Amino acid sequence: MKHELSSMKAFVILAESSSFNNAAKLLNITQPALTRRIKKMEEDLHVQLFERTTRKVTLTKAGKRLLPEARELIKKFDETLFNIRDMNAYHRGMVTLACIPTAVFYFLPLAIGKFNELYPNIKVRILEQGTNNCMESVLCNESDFGINMNNVTNSSIDFTPLVNEPFVLACRRDHPLAKKQLVEWQELVGYKMIGVRSSSGNRLLIEQQLADKPWKLDWFYEVRHLSTSLGLVEAGLGISALPGLAMPHAPYSSIIGIPLVEPVIRRTLGIIRRKDAVLSPAAERFFALLINLWTDDKDNLWTNIVERQRHALQEIG
């Protein structure tokens, strides 16, 4: 069976987009040209690959059988080209990553720096987004994959967990709660809380975990970004409950983070990707690098957070 690789790619893109018009745009060819390419492929195979309607196209039984094989063939071909170019370090291309802000702050610069050392000609584009937009970016193929929370789920998405992090209290060092080693959530009642908007993944997680409590937190100030809440905390306007990763690396002169308990609320961060996505060789390598770096460094994550808290408490005492 002799098929041009371009025809195989056209078949895969048409199958994923379910539209000749959309597929033609993605391939940067005219719709008639795409139609001819698919028709020629069907004639060579002596089988119909698509059922065509006025609104969209769907795969036939033969098309469904061919699709995973076609994806694998394209992936292998791209990897072969990538590996050949690897010998001369002439990589080109771009990896697009959707990412929630706190993950960006903690380790992404390290990962990008390492990736750039290995593949200096591959660009990395970061789409810093909230949990829902991060998921949508991956679903619509705007990004190759993303780093997100696991409480935002979709049946079309695979989630690879990276870290399970607890929430901490962020308050000024002169706050009444600042000298405590641990703070119970109920102890926050009566204080003005600074939180991200109620539709955010972090806020939803907190409210779900505390929904059965007879008391309620006073979300007095609402912001868009966790970093903004830290600024308001530093100004003495209130206190905040943040994921551990959101606490600054370099200790603020006036802010401390204290573990929150009763209950301990955690969020799980990980890599999200479409189940049917075929990552480019460059994206596959960045994906693997992120997992390896996080696995190697995760033992230091909470050590660093605890050390920052311990030193801050010593300074207060």
From Swiss-Prot:
Pfam family, one: LysR_substrate
Swiss-Prot/TrEMBL keywords: DNA-binding, Transcription, Transcription regulation
CDD domains reported in the protein's UniProt record: PBP2_LTTR_like_4 (cd08440)
Source superkingdom: Bacteria
DNA-binding region: 20-40
The family this protein is said to belong to: Belongs to the LysR transcriptional regulatory family.
Name this polypeptide is given: Uncharacterized HTH-type transcriptional regulator YbhD
Organism: Escherichia coli (strain K12)
Gene: ybhD
